[in-house]
């Protein structure tokens, strides 16, 4: 039930809604700590992780992850509707003057370079849709995309479900500098 009243009805019955939340970086502790603890020790991975943390440090994450089919930058059906919900947040007066950060991720299968390129294509695909859906609200320089590759997994890459969870894009917002 995608309407606000439908989601409120679901919440009133104690069920989990699909309403998006805005989560500050400070509330991402346990999730991001696992990234550091599971991090690779090679220099390229460490640089990507550092860049991710630097960009997201004063940002807030929109609470949905956009999923992709394996090996490509094609959004799944749910992600297409989630982008519309993200656009509603972007267009709200509350976030006027904010920029949007789009972080693409991959599972760990394949080389780091290939996964970084794939995750960048995923982030770019979401960026393109956000720009297309929000003329007058977002201009090219208000949306930045980054490929993070397999650096920050949310699932175990040893299982199909875990790999699916890791093939995602996260959208964050922060005040423009």
Q: What are the functions of these language-model segments?
A:
Residues 78, 105-177:
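Periplasmic OmpA-like peptidoglycan-binding domain that tethers envelope proteins to the cell wall
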Residues 2-99, 175-177:
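Periplasmic peptidoglycan-binding/tethering modules of Gram-negative envelope proteins
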